[in-house]
Regions:
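N-terminal small/glycine-rich loop or linker at the start of catalytic domains
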Residues: 1-6, 56-67, 102-113
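N-terminal substrate-binding region of glycoside hydrolase catalytic domains
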Residues: 21-39, 59-63
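Glycine-rich, proline-tolerant flexible connector loops at the mouths of alpha/beta enzymes
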Residues: 31-50, 100-107
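Active-site acidic/histidine proton-transfer and metal-coordination neighborhood
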Residues: 73-175
Length: 262
């Protein structure tokens, strides 16, 4: 299994040192912040060349969601995502992770009434995805549509929700990213959800049930990894979560070593 990581606060700030550190820890790739990639493109290219550590994907680094309630923010976000995809193409990255929105609204907390209809949600998100599908085709990249749990987003919560957008809009460059943390909240059976969407599953985020490092909670990673292997999943699985320990770097190394046994 190819395992990557996002940034952690205890990683070096210098870009080359960061890449060296991630590789030395034993990771196979780096999921970079989109803004860091765009603003320091030459440094990132040099770090990739020096270390041989690939940038797998980008996550974050733009302002405005593809399902944003504010149209100006949505359009601005699309342009920023476009630039990130262009930069990813320059460094050999696969694509960008994109949720409908994060923290914008939830039916689970007051006021519990959305300022936009469900039909309006579908139109806006679909319009955004069709636009990005063309950008991804032009740049040879992929948009990974991420379902979030019900407390962080109200539009796309399950892998089936993401699948519906892809199928109904006939999107060619959009795939699903399955995030174990969110899936543990939303899916009836995580392994079955992975299997049912194996044809569109392009990327995976991992954290344990409490959002901390794998191996410290209750998720059955062996079962989930076995499912991915049975389905011949070829993508990366990427650490996205916090680390809880007295010695953060050592705990991160231990988690990765443990995960390699799953």
């Amino acid at each position: 299994m190819k395992i990557g990581t996002q940034n952690q606060a205890f990683f070096p700030q210098n870009i080359l040192e960061k890449f060296c550190y991630i590789k030395e820890m034993g990771f196979d790739g780096f999921e970079i912040d989109g803004k860091l990639l765009v603003n320091h493109l030459d440094e990132v290219k040099a770090a990739i060349k020096e270390t041989g550590l690939p940038v797998t994907t980008a996550c974050g680094g733009y302002d405005g969601w593809i399902g944003d309630f504010i149209e100006e923010r949505r359009l601005n976000g699309l342009k920023q995502i476009e630039r990130i995809l262009e930069a990813l193409a320059e460094v050999g990255g696969q694509g960008i992770i994109v949720p409908a929105a994060w923290g914008m609204f939830t039916f689970r907390l007051p006021p519990m009434v959305s300022p936009r209809s469900l039909e309006g949600d579908r139109k806006v998100v679909s319009d955004s995805l069709r636009y990005l599908d063309k950008v991804a085709e032009r740049t040879g990249t992929t948009v990974y549509l991420e379902p979030l749990n019900r407390y962080q987003d109200h539009m796309i919560n399950t892998l089936a929700d993401a699948r519906r957008y892809i199928v109904e809009n006939d999107l060619k460059q959009v795939k699903i990213i399955g995030d174990f943390y969110h899936m543990n909240i939303e899916e009836d059976d995580m392994a079955k959800a992975l299997h049912d969407n194996r044809d569109l599953l392009g990327h995976v985020h991992i954290a344990d049930n409490h959002r901390y490092q794998p191996g410290t909670g209750t998720l059955n990673f062996r079962r989930l990894f076995d499912q991915l292997r049975d389905d011949r999943y070829q993508g990366y699985v990427v650490y996205e979560g916090r680390v809880r320990a007295e010695n953060l770097p050592e705990a991160y190394r231990q988690s990765l070593a443990w995960l390699r046994t799953c």
